């Protein structure tokens, strides 16, 4: 099992997001501890939940202007 440094991983996640014009609203390690679940707002104003793993955002669920649905999806993905 690969162990990640949570402090530098978080800094890297925010750096990657900033370069893409993404605002991270919340991020939390998934129950497995091997990846992070991210709630964010894209440069187009959409809300999205992503998996952040190995320095990349993946498996996005997009919600046009609906923070409530995105927050519910985030809560489900984190648990």
Model-predicted regions and their roles:
Residues 1-30:
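Negatively charged, low-complexity tracts enriched in Asp/Glu with abundant Ser/Thr
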Residues 8-10, 32, 59, 79:
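Generic serine detector
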């Amino acid at each position: 099992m690969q162990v990640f440094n949570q402090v530098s991983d978080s800094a890297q996640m925010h750096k990657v997001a900033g370069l893409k014009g993404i605002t991270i609203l919340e991020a939390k390690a998934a129950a497995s501890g091997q990846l992070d679940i991210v709630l964010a707002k894209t440069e187009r104003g959409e809300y999205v939940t992503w998996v952040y793993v190995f320095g990349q955002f993946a498996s996005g669920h997009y919600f046009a202007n609906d923070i409530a649905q995105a927050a519910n999806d985030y809560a489900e993905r984190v648990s």
